[in-house]
């Protein structure tokens, strides 16, 4: 694999020499940092099984190497990367996999370790969505996830990835993560804080990541991280699990932040060792039981993961002073909900009791029941999935609902050819050789729902959202 030149400040190298365990070679660290990062993907088990995914992609000649800490994760090598980006493959467009760095799969593995099965989870810094979608898959779209993102520009990307992966149990918020301890005290069974950090572990992906690095900036970032972990710990219920992670390597932003929390709440914080998380985890284990992953250990990004348990309640913070405002939705009455459910089922859309119908004007939404306790406590950017818009002739079913709820075995499902599916993703109407009989057609490809079409004569009218339409070469070049 080709080398690339990484910029290392002298003070950073000094710091790394001091931080690195004696069992590791500093020369190996430098060599690993100069190697480009291995690409990796995670199979979306909400859409397919790992076995079915491997069978589907076998003709492409991809080399998939299992990632030890994530059963559905693989390092991927493929000859056609220049000809066809992974993001343009049919399997990616339909949400069968997520392009995710291997080490970033570690925090969610830690969150669900030892049979942990939380029902209400918060992802404090969620964009672009790799960990939120991984959490949703582990929860099998049950329960509820609050996915927060402080950066307004990244909320849209977060929603797009959640929608592509067919996720229905997520509520999105746009807050500074430091508000949650006061706003929603002891409301979550599990919390992931993948904290903003100095990014020292990402130099294999971005050789210039350390151009603005300084020891002073590490200290400033660590101060923010302490405030974030304190807030998250307040939002965690007693007995709940908190996973703290970063993609940086210095102790100040990693071990020291967790030790500060334990010093602050000595009777309420328990460190849960991660040495048995996967075979070989002990190679990165710290004396506290955390995983401090230097890039040469597993040939991945540098990363840090700690798992904590809240053993008892702590004093509640003063209530926040902001006003949430009136909630613009109201629950749909049972009789009407039954009619809506019946109409949705006729086009292949079905949902279980984890989701409840709500209405705003002519919009119909499905909210995860587990998030209802937070209504009135935080302001949501987006909640659940938009099911439909009502009009005089019935319902206009929404694309994100089709991706999340549709069964490909529905009587009105219509399987496209690869060429027809490409036309669909380009936003063009499709002219199949043998047109379907139904007027409302559930369009599928590779037996996966990819949209809903109106049949007009021999034409399938495209309803693929304009913002998702793709240009350039697509997947007929996969094989």
UniProtKB/Swiss-Prot annotation:
It holds the Pfam family Methyltr_RsmF_N. Coiled coil: none annotated. Its EC number is 2.1.1.178. It is found in: Cytoplasm. SUPFAM superfamilies: S-adenosyl-L-methionine-dependent methyltransferases (SSF53335). GO terms for biological process: rRNA base methylation. GO terms for molecular function: RNA binding; rRNA (cytosine-C5-)-methyltransferase activity. InterPro entries: Methyltr_RsmF_N, MeTrfase_RsmB-F_NOP2_cat, MeTrfase_RsmB-F_NOP2_dom, Nol1_Nop2_Fmu_2, Nop2p, RCMT, rRNA_ssu_MeTfrase_F, RsmB/NOL1/NOP2-like_CS. The keyword RNA-binding applies. It is an enzyme of class 2 (transferase). S-adenosyl-L-methionine binds at residues 125-131, 149, 176, 194. Keywords: Cytoplasm, Methyltransferase, RNA-binding, rRNA processing, S-adenosyl-L-methionine, Transferase. One of its GO terms (cellular component) is cytoplasm. Its main location: cytoplasm. It catalyses: cytidine(1407) in 16S rRNA + S-adenosyl-L-methionine = 5-methylcytidine(1407) in 16S rRNA + S-adenosyl-L-homocysteine + H(+). The keyword S-adenosyl-L-methionine applies. The active site is at 247 (nucleophile). Belongs to the class I-like SAM-binding methyltransferase superfamily. RsmB/NOP family. Specifically methylates the cytosine at position 1407 (m5C1407) of 16S rRNA. PANTHER family: 28S RRNA (CYTOSINE(4447)-C(5))-METHYLTRANSFERASE-RELATED, NOP2 YEAST -RELATED NOL1/NOP2/FMU SUN DOMAIN-CONTAINING. This is Ribosomal RNA small subunit methyltransferase F.
């Amino acid at each position: 694999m080709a080398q690339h030149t990484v910029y290392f400040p002298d003070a950073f190298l000094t710091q790394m020499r001091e931080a690195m365990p004696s069992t590791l070679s500093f020369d190996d660290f430098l060599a690993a940092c100069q190697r480009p990062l291995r690409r990796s993907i995670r199979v979306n088990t909400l859409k397919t099984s790992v076995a079915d995914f491997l069978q589907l992609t076998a003709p492409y000649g991809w080399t998939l190497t299992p990632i030890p800490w994530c059963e559905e994760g693989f390092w991927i090598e493929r000859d056609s990367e220049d000809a066809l980006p992974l993001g343009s493959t049919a399997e990616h467009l339909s949400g069968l996999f997520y392009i995710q760095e291997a080490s970033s799969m570690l925090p969610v593995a830690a969150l669900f370790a030892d049979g942990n099965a939380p029902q209400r989870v918060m992802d404090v810094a969620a964009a672009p969505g790799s960990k939120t979608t991984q959490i949703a898959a582990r929860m099998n779209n049950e329960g509820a996830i609050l996915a927060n993102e402080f950066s307004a520009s990244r909320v849209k990307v977060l929603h797009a990835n959640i929608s592509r992966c067919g996720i229905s149990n997520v509520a999105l918020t746009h807050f500074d993560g430091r508000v949650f301890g006061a706003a929603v005290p002891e409301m979550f069974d599990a919390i992931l804080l993948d904290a903003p950090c100095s990014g020292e572990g990402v130099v294999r992906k971005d050789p210039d990541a350390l151009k603005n690095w300084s020891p002073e900036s590490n200290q400033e970032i660590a101060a923010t991280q302490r405030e974030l972990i304190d807030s998250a710990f307040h939002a965690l219920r007693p007995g709940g699990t908190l996973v703290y992670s970063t993609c940086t390597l210095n102790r100040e932003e990693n071990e020291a932040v967790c030790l500060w929390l334990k010093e602050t709440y000595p009777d309420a914080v328990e460190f849960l060792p991660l040495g048995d998380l996967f075979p070989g985890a002990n190679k990165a284990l710290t004396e506290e039981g955390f995983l401090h992953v230097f890039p040469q250990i597993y040939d991945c990004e540098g990363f840090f993961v700690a798992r904590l348990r809240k053993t008892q309640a702590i004093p509640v913070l003063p209530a926040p002073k902001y006003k949430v405002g009136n909630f613009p939705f109201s629950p749909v009455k049972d009789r009407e909900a039954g009619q809506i459910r019946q109409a949705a089922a006729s086009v292949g859309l079905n949902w279980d009791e984890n989701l409840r119908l709500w209405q705003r004007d002519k919009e119909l939404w499905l909210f995860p029941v587990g998030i209802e306790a937070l209504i009135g406590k935080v302001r949501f950017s987006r909640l659940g999935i938009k099911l439909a818009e009502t009009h005089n002739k019935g319902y206009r079913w929404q694309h994100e609902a089709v991706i999340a709820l549709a069964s490909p075995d529905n009587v009105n499902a219509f399987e496209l050819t690869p060429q027809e599916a490409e036309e669909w993703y380009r936003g063009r109407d499709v002219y199949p050789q043998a047109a379907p009989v139904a007027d409302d057609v559930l369009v599928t490809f590779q037996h996966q729902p990819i949209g809903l079409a109106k049949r007009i004569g021999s034409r399938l009218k495209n309803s693929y959202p304009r913002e998702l339409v793709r240009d350039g070469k697509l997947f007929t070049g996969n094989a």
